[in-house]
Amino acid sequence: MASAAAATTEKGSPVVVGLLVMGNIIILLSGLALFAETVWVTADQYRIYPLMGVSGKDDVFAGAWIAIFCGFSFFVVASFGVGAALCRRRSMILTYLILMLIIYIFECASCITSYTHRDYMVSNPSLITKQMLTFYSADSNQGRELTRLWDRIMIEQECCGTSGPMDWVNFTSAFRATTPEVVFPWPPLCCRRTGNFIPVNEEGCRLGHLDYLFTKGCFEHIGHAIDSYTWGISWFGFAILMWTLPVMLIAMYFYTTL
């Protein structure tokens, strides 16, 4: 009788059940947050996808799509895990563990993919510079798309080129092929403008007067945009994985006691 009572107590340990319920509630809430965060990433609020797409390093967004699936799956499976813990059924716990392991692997792939491609773009300003010089003002679909992107960034962020206006002077470019340096050494949108979008002093800008020319580069803004996407996908994803692992280990222990 005593051994049977002990087995029953072991099987229905309120501490283990409580830990599983609490852990899975946090996972399901985190899954919803990850889902919302990665939907925001795929919406591309900074509108820099063309910049990453032309380099073939747009897998930050591929990682986001995987994370959308994983975020929703974390919510569903963690909700199931709460029920499995409360029901104390081996078959339900085993199903929960198998499903969670599959999601865990996919989320690992999402985090690693996003971070590695982010590192390739952000740690290499020369790549962004090369793209800008190659495609800005180029007469192609990619050229027109990249030209619109750079025009918008330079206007909104009040910047010029990747590192500064001298990018357009020190290197050959598609822009230079269409606009000689004596006509305009850098794109006219590098000029400071009034509230009515009129250049403050176009001639002063053309001559490089610092009061009429944007002197900072745009790479800081581009890097910040890519970092923002990566933090949402990779680092938050890694945080969820770090929490999920001990919850899964507790679930494995709980399974052995049933």
Curated annotation (Swiss-Prot):
This is Uroplakin-1a. CDD domains: uroplakin_I_like_LEL. The keyword Transmembrane helix applies. Glycans are attached at N170. Its main location: membrane. Homodimer; disulfide-linked. Interacts with uroplakin-2 (UPK2). It comes from Bos taurus (Bovine). The chain crosses the membrane at residues 15-35, 60-86, 92-112, 231-252. Belongs to the tetraspanin (TM4SF) family. The gene is UPK1A. Bladder epithelium. The N-terminus is blocked. It comes from the Eukaryota. GO terms for biological process: epithelial cell differentiation. Residues 1-14, 87-91, 253-258 are cytoplasmic. InterPro entries: Tetraspanin/Peripherin, Tetraspanin_animals, Tetraspanin_EC2_sf. It is found in: Membrane. Residues 36-59, 113-230 are extracellular. Disulfide bonds: none annotated. One of its GO terms (cellular component) is endoplasmic reticulum. Keywords: Disulfide bond, Glycoprotein, Membrane, Transmembrane, Transmembrane helix. Pfam families: Tetraspanin (PF00335). Component of the asymmetric unit membrane (AUM); a highly specialized biomembrane elaborated by terminally differentiated urothelial cells. May play an important role in normal bladder epithelial physiology, possibly in regulating membrane permeability of superficial umbrella cells or in stabilizing the apical membrane through AUM/cytoskeletal interactions. One of its GO terms (molecular function) is structural molecule activity. It is a multi-pass membrane protein.
